[in-house]
Structures are given as structure tokens and as C-alpha cells.
Amino acid sequence: MRLTDPGADMLTRVRNALQARHQKVDVPASRLKVEIARILKEEGYISNFKATEEEGHKVIRIYLKYGAHNEAAISKADRVSRPGCRVYVRRSEIPRVLGGMGINILTTPRGVMTGRQARKEGVGGELLCEIW
């Protein structure tokens, strides 16, 4: 079966694993998903991730993060730009998520980065998702 929106599939798998209180989740690998996982780790939303190969398929194993009272580090993860309705923003139009408490992830000509990094570097791009 072919996925029409692999980014949304990754976010959904992570959300479902967090609700089920799993320690890790495997998602099919792609360069974009590895970059999203890297940003989530840098921003402290996941513990770690590892790109591996299992049974001939490349997968990303994402180790989820929970707080002291077993609350998930990610409260909400929403896909913004979709295959049927792409959302592009200029540097000045990049929204702040929860007044700076969350992050948004963009693909830019300089690579995948957070909204904060994109504003700092002065670039816009496709607004992939918002996480808090």
C-alpha cells in the first residue's frame, strides 16, 4: 500500500504510541522523516531516534519521552501542509506556536528547520507541522 502523506503517517504513529504509553515506535524511513526526528530530538520532544534496517526495510526507531508524572512530552502534533493543500509561508508569516512554547517545522531551500531557525536565517518555506 502506498501512502499519500508519509509525514502525517509519522506524526500519527508517534501520537498513537504516546497515547498507548509505548517507549518506542517504528516508522518507515525517508530523508524527510529523519530530519523531522532530528529536530524533535534537538527540541527535546523525543529521547532519541535511530535509523536502522529491519527485514529489508529501512525504519526509524523513535524513542519517546515522558515527564516525571508519565505525561507525554508531545501534547499535540498537527500536520499543516498536506498533499492536497500545500501551505507556504514567507519569513514574516511564520506563525509562533503557543506564543513560543511549541515549534513548527518547515522545509526551506536551506533544509528542514524549525520556524525559529527559519526566521533567524531569513527564509520561508513549506510549513509541515506544528508540535507542542
Predicted features, each with a name:
Residues M1-W132:
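Core subunits and conserved enzymes of cellular information-processing
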